[in-house]
Amino acid sequence: MQTTETQIMPNRFSFIRKRLRQKVIANLLMLLVLIPVGFLIAMPFMWMLTASLKVRGHMAEGPMLFPATFDFSNYVTAWQGAPFGRYYINTIIVAFGIVVSRLLIGSMAAYAFAILKFKGRDFLFMAYMTTMMIPFYAIVIPLYLIIRDFSWFNTYQALIVPRMVDAFGILLLRQAFIAVPKDYIDAARIDGCTHWQILWKQIIPLSLPTILTVSIFNFMFAWNDFMWPFLVANDTHMRVIQTGLQAFSGRYLTEWTYWMAGTVMTTIPPIVLFLFAQKKFISGLSRTGMKA
């Protein structure tokens, strides 16, 4: 018996050492791939940040991680060269309106497609999902004519109302709602909860990671949107951050340091938002596995 145990223990230890060695090698290989890829992804932003800190007229210098001299006055000049404060306020208002409306409407639609039972539900859902294949450019002229007929040019309504519904967000929310255990829903019905109460007191709290993921997607969309705001709200007092940056770049076309400083100011908020919410963002995506 003792001889058998002494034979098993070395074999077990050698197996563990072998598995640990394989794991270390796999992690090293992964790092060897991820570090260069991460550097390539971050390089454009690093170049933009470096260019924004260079002294005016030194843009022709070769690329470097840090400039020889830091010139933070480029940011002051860029901020004073255009009403970026107003652009930020407009963009935040528009982004808030789009995010809230898409969450409110999307949650109700996703609840209907995931929880309610009615004839033709799956067909309606698939028909609605096909709208994701229609490019925005195919409907931009009808939308533009509607905004003109309503006299909504250079208003928040023109920037928010056409963007209040999002099929992709409804898809993510529906998948999250389907994953909620039916026992919770049945218990809420036994307690006499209405559909509205079930949605807001049971489904939404259990789907917060997905709610946050959809919110981040919608915020990024609103923050980066250029074409539609450029068409319907191009007055100085109604410009959002992207159209404001375009107007600023037209004014300082040859001043690359100022242009890069303005670009950095427009990219910082989404980056900061994602850094703080990335764990919830990834968790929300992992929870929305495609379930029938």
Regions found by a protein language model. Give the residues of each.
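Short, Lys/Arg-rich, polar N-terminal cytosolic tail immediately upstream
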Residues: 1-21
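A structural signal for multi-pass alpha-helical bundles of membrane permease subunits
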Residues: 8, 18, 26-292
